[in-house]
Amino acid sequence: MKKIWFHLDLQFFASKKGVGSTKNGRDSNPKFLGAKLADGQQAKTGQIIYRQRGNKIWPGKNVGQGKDDTLFALADGIVRYTKFLGNKTKVSVVEQSK
């Protein structure tokens, strides 16, 4: 009996399609964080001074902090940014005398 040899050539195809472009096509909406009023600008009561996540800037006199860490004016006056404890920044609203 004569032996017969078979040459098998196997090819494996991808079981999952390469979908990098569809998986990467997302982007979040802008949050518009940062300073809304600069040092020396006039602030009215309730006006947003600084939008932030966490305490990048700390509230000082006449400045309140919302639950999303937004800083806002509690009184009419001039916005002042000052450094304290070395590298921390505090924002205050200085009331003007009438």
Curated annotation (Swiss-Prot):
SUPFAM superfamilies, alphabetized: Ribosomal L27 protein-like
GO cellular component: cytosolic large ribosomal subunit
Keyword Ribonucleoprotein: yes
Entry's Gene Ontology molecular function annotations: structural constituent of ribosome
Post-translation changes: The N-terminus is cleaved by ribosomal processing cysteine protease Prp.
Domain of life: Bacteria
Key words, A-Z: Ribonucleoprotein, Ribosomal protein
Similarity annotation: Belongs to the bacterial ribosomal protein bL27 family.
Name of the protein: Large ribosomal subunit protein bL27
Species this chain originates from: Mycoplasmoides gallisepticum (strain R(low / passage 15 / clone 2)) (Mycoplasma gallisepticum)
Gene it is expressed from: rpmA
